[in-house]
From Swiss-Prot:
Note on cofactor: Binds 1 zinc ion per subunit.
Annotated positions binding Zn(2+): C333, H384, H510
Protein source organism: Rickettsia peacockii (strain Rustic)
Function: Catalyzes the attachment of threonine to tRNA(Thr) in a two-step reaction: L-threonine is first activated by ATP to form Thr-AMP and then transferred to the acceptor end of tRNA(Thr). Also edits incorrectly charged L-seryl-tRNA(Thr).
Listed GO MF terms: ATP binding; metal ion binding; threonine-tRNA ligase activity; tRNA binding
SMART domains: tRNA_SAD
Localization, UniProt: Cytoplasm
Protein name (Swiss-Prot/TrEMBL): Threonine--tRNA ligase
Required cofactor(s): Zn(2+)
TM ranges: none
Region (Catalytic): 242-533
Organism lineage: Bacteria, Pseudomonadati, Pseudomonadota, Alphaproteobacteria, Rickettsiales
Nucleotide-binding listed as a keyword: yes
Gene designation per UniProt: thrS
Length: 635
């Protein structure tokens, strides 16, 4: 007999060689019917797994969040099965679960069409309703390679041949379809009920542009119809808010082929950019940061010394000149260390908080570029804190508070923290890592955050915090980071004189709040759906005259607003007032100042705020005061 421990703390005895499914059935038939996979000693397994030793067991159903990835992986296999039934000449390659769904890559001569997706999805529904049994099989490597070659699946044969010797070769069979997979999977295809195929895109085999182009079908799958419908509704709303679409409509920026991944900022977009930079500059000055500016083009010797040349060379833009290799900086940290090293630093100089709106360049693949969200030229609200080990907690607490203030000012209050601890391969002793991790954990708790752990996901040079925002339609964006670094000060020979007189290495905290300004502006455009708050809007007040004989007064009002730092636009054309109001509303300008004869007579304006038909009559001085008060809160 074996002892099986359950999540409620109970321990029950069962005969050896019992399957997880049989245990579930012994507990209740309803549990066995709903069961998808088993968690045995913390590891997810198929329900068919044979249990022959004492263990901790948890039976998972579709209600458990861990099963969402299983459902999506199952949906990927279901997609491949449907494609093979409909288009048998197609070769299958790989199909993992990803955030919000899955994809499967196929090799075929004829591209899939939108009509094909509808047919494939219908076939998937049919296969789901068949509720085909899914079984796991262990195969001999050579036999598996020969089998897939014999049925024309050469990509699968190549994958199997590349699996290290000694690793098991597991295949999963459902109906007439068989696929290479580690698993686990649910026991039948019927668990995949709520799904939709989204689009087809190109993808290179093994992600290498030198290889052949495959066709990638993207899909989404959920545990319930309500979840699927909610997700599709969110996508519909996201499409309306797409920053690329709004960027064109609101005349904020554009991209073009001659400068891929580089933003052409228009005056209104550049206004938003500069306002955010001004806001951040005020915040960091209040929090004891100095601001610096470092070169964009730096000799490769510095990147070699820092380790970036070895690690990021393929992502860097480099050029040869005067027998030297220069590189556009992909990040600011090595340059900040050079400033720290100018002159002798004492423990009294620490913590030293050094910030920069640093222009960086990264050679992103053209296929990865995505509007403002993924660019090749970017400016980071970057800072590095040089401190002693005993100052880590206080500095992290201060940073968390600053970050919270900033996010709140932009309207983000739902902030999640991810904590990435030591990886297997790392620099520094366990004692150093213990102290570093404990310092960050203590700081996060002091700042009032809870965190989720990403085990082993820290950099080799130190643990990391990531700050994730949730936007108005429920999407999550990782923006802020705080990365501890024991290694770069050592590599670049940064030191300070301790109170004892000995030379010590500072700890370096890499931190950013917004990430890149480009990406954060993209997030804000979608968060606000283009309706920027008054202090941030590129045009704060638009002036519209009812008749042309009021134009002189309108120009007086505009001059008064501009003289007081209010960003304005005006329309004194002979167009009808309703047209002018509609046009300014479409441009999502927060305040429209309507001028009629009464307003001219009383030296006033009638203010209509975006999204309302109500009007509020103000003197020009009152209007200026309203805008100034809002600006001064943030700027």
């Amino acid at each position: 007999m074996i002892n099986i421990s359950f999540p409620d703390g109970s321990i029950k005895q069962f005969a050896k060689n019992i399957t997880a499914y049989e245990v579930a059935n012994a507990i209740s038939m309803s549990l066995a019917k709903a069961a998808m996979v088993a968690e045995i000693n913390g590891e997810l397994q198929d329900l068919s797994i044979v249990i022959d030793n004492d263990c901790k067991l948890r039976i998972l159903t579709a209600k458990d969040p861990e099963c969402l990835e299983i459902i999506r992986h199952d949906a990927a296999h279901l997609t491949a099965e449907a494609v093979k039934e409909l288009f048998p000449e197609t070769q299958v390659t790989i199909g993992p679960a990803i955030e919000n769904g899955y994809y499967y890559d196929f090799a075929r001569d004829t591209p899939f069409t939108t009509d094909d997706l509808a047919v494939i999805e219908a076939k998937m529904q049919e296969l789901s309703q068949k509720n085909e049994q899914v079984t796991r099989e262990l195969w001999d490597r050579d036999k598996a390679v020969e089998f897939f070659k014999s049925i024309g699946e050469h990509y699968k044969a190549e994958i199997i041949a590349s699996i290290p010797a000694g690793e098991p070769i597991t295949l999963y069979r459902q109906g007439n379809f068989i696929d290479l997979c580690r698993g686990p999977h649910a026991p039948s295809t019927g668990v995949v009920k709520h799904f939709k195929l989204m689009k087809v895109a190109g993808a290179y085999w093994r992600g290498d542009s030198r290889n052949e182009m495959l066709q990638r079908i993207y899909g989404t799958a959920w545990a319930t119809k309500e979840q699927l419908d909610s997700y599709l509704l969110m996508l519909e709303e996201a499409e309306k808010r797409d920053h690329r679409k709004l960027g064109r409509e609101l005349d904020l920026f554009h991209f073009q082929e001659e400068a891929q991944g580089m933003v052409f900022w228009h005056d209104k977009g550049w206004s938003i950019y500069n306002t955010i930079e001004q806001y951040i500059r005020k915040k960091i000055r209040k929090n004891g940061y100095t601001e610096v500016k470092t070169p964009v083009l730096v000799d490769k010797s510095l990147w070699e010394a820092s380790g970036h040349w070895e690690k990021f060379r393929d992502d860097m833009f480099a050029l040869e000149t005067d027998d030297k290799t220069l590189a556009l900086k992909p990040m600011n940290c090595p340059c900040h260390v050079q400033i720290f090293k100018q002159g002798i630093k004492s423990y009294r100089d620490l913590p030293l908080r050094m910030s920069e709106f640093g222009l960086c360049h990264r050679n992103e693949a053209s296929g990865a570029l995505h509007g403002l969200m993924r660019v090749r030229s970017l400016v980071q609200d970057d800072a590095h804190i040089f401190c002693a080990a005993e100052q880590i907690t206080d500095e992290t607490v201060s940073f968390c508070k600053l970050l919270t203030e900033v996010y709140k000012d932009f309207g983000f209050t739902d902030i999640k923290v991810k904590f990435s601890d030591r990886p297997e391969i790392r620099a520094g002793s366990n004692e150093v890592w213990d102290k570093a991790e404990n310092a960050l954990k203590e700081a996060v708790e002091q700042a009032g955050f809870t965190y989720t752990l990403n085990p082993g996901e820290g950099a080799f040079y130190g643990p990391k915090l990531e700050f994730v925002l949730t936007d108005a339609i429920g999407r999550q964006w990782q923006c802020g980071t705080l990365q501890m670094d024991f290694v770069l000060p050592e590599r670049l020979d940064a030191s300070y004189v301790a109170a004892s007189g000995e030379k010590k290495r500072p700890v370096m905290l890499h931190r950013a709040i917004l990430g890149s300004l480009e990406r954060f502006i993209g997030i804000l455009i979608e968060e606000y759906a283009g309706r920027f708050p008054l202090w941030l809007a590129p045009v704060q007040v638009a002036i519209a005259t009812i008749t042309s004989d009021l134009n002189d007064y309108a120009l007086e009002v505009q001059k008064a607003l501009i003289d007081n730092g209010v960003r304005t636009d005006f329309n004194i054309s002979p167009d009808k007032i309703n047209y002018k109001i509609r046009e300014f509303s479409n441009q999502k300008i927060p305040m429209i100042a309507v001028i009629g004869k009464q307003e001219q007579k009383n030296k006033q304006v009638a203010i209509r705020r975006l999204g309302t038909t109500d009007q509020e009559v103000l003197s020009v001085e009152q209007l200026i005061a309203v805008v100034k008060e809002e600006n001064e809160k943030y700027l």
